[in-house]
Amino acid sequence: MNSEGIGELVVKGPSVAIGYYNDEEANKKAYDGEWFHTGDLAQIDEEGYIFICGRKKSVIVLRNGKNIFPEEMESLINQIDGVKESFIFGKQQSADKNDVKINVEIVFDRTMINEKYQAITDNEIYQALSKKIKQINGTLPRYKAIRGVILSEQPLIKTTTNKIKRQENLDAINKFKNTFIG
């Protein structure tokens, strides 16, 4: 558990699967005796309610040891009018793998952005959405601040269950660096 009271959710009980079929390696990673490690990061409030914060494998660990939960930040960004979806990722700044800055790819609806913010050109759209990101940054601890923005009208790469494929999206970003970046 970290300093914010967030840790991996582990469960046991009669409705929990007894293991992965013919996959001993996966069983070793996921099971600790009777306890199943879900891979979900969760927090329990004072009343005992469990809140899922994100996935363990998607956490971005900063040089100061602080954790960024992309799903938490994406939910904030996705509330911006004209934003269809977003993808938070860490961009490495030096040889130190934990020296990262938080960036976001925003998939936007051009028509809605034009109507809501009277933004027509790519630069006007960038300015309108950057202003909204700055407002969100003002509500977050400084270490969580979004430092870079990529705009796209193309949907994010997702699984058949509509979950963001984080590595594939990051690979696409690294491949196509000619995207409008601020």
Segments (PLM) and residue ranges:
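Conserved ATP-binding/catalytic segment of the ANL
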Residues: 2-63, 67-70
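Conserved C-terminal "lid"/linker of ANL adenylate-forming enzymes
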Residues: 87-90, 134-182
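Conserved C-terminal helical docking segment of ANL/AMP-forming enzymes
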Residues: 67, 81-85, 110-151
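C-terminal boundary motif of the adenylate-forming
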Residues: 41, 46, 80-110
